[in-house]
């Protein structure tokens, strides 16, 4: 589709071109896919045609997002997203928990590894109903929400605002009322 539409690919040497990356997030169990077009430009020509071409080839596609990253940097994603079609996230379900995962949020890519981490949490921490858990750098809440089903309260902290927003949504998706999520660095959020 890129060749067909002749979208100029980004050249990091001189900063020319529009398309920096194409990022695909796919749910391991849900099989939903989100395509993120990382561009140096806020608008792309023939974007509807591009979306239609991709949708025909990827039936599991649930959304296409344009991410703006105009800076000459090795950071992949910029801060600003706009939905070109569909959803701005995928939904994944792991260990009976539903997770809303957006373009800029961190989520464990190795789901079987995440399930093993859950087993280790149970084995080594032996969470109890009276416990209060702090999840520093919680991302979308994958560990925090797992623990929230077992303990009195969970507090999650992350400096990525998109991840915190997803964590709050995920807590609601799973009907968990014993969670608090805070945006900021751990060093600034926690009292010394």
Where are these regions (language model features)?
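Extended interfacial segments that mediate partner engagement and assembly in macromolecular machines
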Residues: 1-11, 29, 44
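Conserved phosphate/pyrophosphate-binding and hydrolysis machinery centered on Walker-type P-loop NTPases
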Residues: 12-16, 111
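Short edge beta-strands and adjacent turn/loop segments
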Residues: 15-29
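Short, aliphatic-rich beta-strand segments
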Residues: 24, 31-40, 98-102
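Short flexible coil/turn linkers enriched for glycine and charged/polar residues
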Residues: 28-31, 60
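Rossmann-like S-adenosyl-L-methionine
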Residues: 46-48, 52-56, 60-192
């Amino acid at each position: 589709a890129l060749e067909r539409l002749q979208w100029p690919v980004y050249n990091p040497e001189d900063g020319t071109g529009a398309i920096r990356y194409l990022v695909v997030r796919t749910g391991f169990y849900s099989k939903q896919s989100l395509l993120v077009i990382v561009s140096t430009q806020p608008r792309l020509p023939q974007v509807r045609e591009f979306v239609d071409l991709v949708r025909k080839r990827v039936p599991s596609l649930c959304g296409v997002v344009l991410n703006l990253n105009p800076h000459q940097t090795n950071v992949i994603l910029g801060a600003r997203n706009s939905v070109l079609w569909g959803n701005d996230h995928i939904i994944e379900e792991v260990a009976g928990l539903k997770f809303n995962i957006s373009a800029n949020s961190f989520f464990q890519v190795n789901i079987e590894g995440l399930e093993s981490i859950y087993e280790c949490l149970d084995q080594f921490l032996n969470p109890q109903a009276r416990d209060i858990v702090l999840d520093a750098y919680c991302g979308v809440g994958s560990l925090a929400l797992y623990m929230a089903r077992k303990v009195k309260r969970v507090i999650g902290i992350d400096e990525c605002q998109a991840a915190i927003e997803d964590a709050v949504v995920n807590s609601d998706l799973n009907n968990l009322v014993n969670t608090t999520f805070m945006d900021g660095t751990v060093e600034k959020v926690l009292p010394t």
